[in-house]
Amino acid sequence: MAATNDPELTRRKQRQEDFLRGTSKINFDDHIDHCVLSGKTAIVTGGASGIGHGIAQALSSNGCKVAVLDLSGPLEAGTDESNIDSPKLFECDVSSWESLLAAFQEVLIWSGNSLDIVVLSAGVRSHNIKDLILERPAGSTSTPVKPPSSVFDVNLLGTYYSAYLALWYFTNLEAKRDEAEFNWKPQLLFIGSLASYVEQPLSADYCASKHGVRGLWKSVRSHSALFGDCQTNLLAPTFIDNRQGSTKSRGDGALISLTNDVKLGEVSDVVAGALRCLCDRNIEGRALCCVKGEQSSPGSNNFDLCDNLIDFNAGKSVLDSFRNGVVGRLGTQNTTGPQ
């Protein structure tokens, strides 16, 4: 059979190949200029504590006007809300559409109808499914009790609502955007987890929710041009020590146990990953794993997960990171443990 010279078929084959291969891998040697953040408006969900707080502070310190969307309560230490340049808290429940929509609308009024960056970092810890099923209170009946759904409500539904609103506003604000300076694209940054790729035993709701965040990101990353020509990336932090000032911390005993196998990263390692994604125009549709960096060099061991079909959907990168000791240990391989 003669080969076809149909140009449309050729274009379709090329689009399919591009889809399978993904965009260019992250070059961590490229210089990034934080000045591109100056004057931008950012929303950080879950930004009152932990990873979200670290990202909000970094954006603010680089000239961003930062709106933190979180439940009521003071921001972590280091934030002075009386300072006009500090992140501003907009109280809301990300799992409630009405609450989240109202918060986005308030931010748009506050910012003068400007929105350039949305970081989806709102999240809560898992429930252990073994504890829920096997460790029932004395005298409980044999009738199953409905398990809590807060992890799905916040981590997955809240992320979906937030991403939906971000894409909606990026699309509708595109006409008024001035891209002359720095050739800027709106930024949508998903916060997944290493649990989006690797099982975390018995953390059923958390793993399911974080796999869902990854699926949500992958469903829109190749079509971001439809939504205000935005840029979408995903961070997948390993276990992160966010104990300082955080209400989402783990007990020291649990930290020691989990870091026998996985190195414990710092919030600053995730912040470094966020700034790289937000400030580098060449990073688009990529997943970046945030791991423990070298001493005094946050983010220095972060790596591209290569989450594309032709690269085994990150499988090889994750396996290599364990084999090489970047994330932790595999089997009997040694690791440095807590640092």
Curated annotation (Swiss-Prot):
Gene name per UniProt: M3
Pathway field: Secondary metabolite biosynthesis
Summary of the function given for this chain in its UniProt record: NADP-dependent dehydrogenase; part of the gene cluster that mediates the biosynthesis of squalestatin S1 (SQS1, also known as zaragozic acid A), a heavily oxidized fungal polyketide that offers potent cholesterol lowering activity by targeting squalene synthase (SS). SQS1 is composed of a 2,8-dioxobicyclic[3.2.1]octane-3,4,5-tricarboxyclic acid core that is connected to two lipophilic polyketide arms.
Location relative to the cell: Cytoplasm, Cytosol
Keyword Chaperone in annotation: no
Broad enzyme group: oxidoreductase
Name listed for the protein in its UniProt record: NADP-dependent dehydrogenase M3
Organism encoding this protein: Phoma sp. (strain ATCC 20986 / MF5453)
Family listed: Belongs to the short-chain dehydrogenases/reductases (SDR) family.
Database matches in PANTHER family: 15-HYDROXYPROSTAGLANDIN DEHYDROGENASE [NAD(+)]
Swiss-Prot/TrEMBL keywords: Cytoplasm, NADP, Oxidoreductase
Subunit architecture: Homodimer.
Enzyme Commission numbers on file: 1.1.1.-
Lineage: Eukaryota, Fungi, Dikarya, Ascomycota, Pezizomycotina
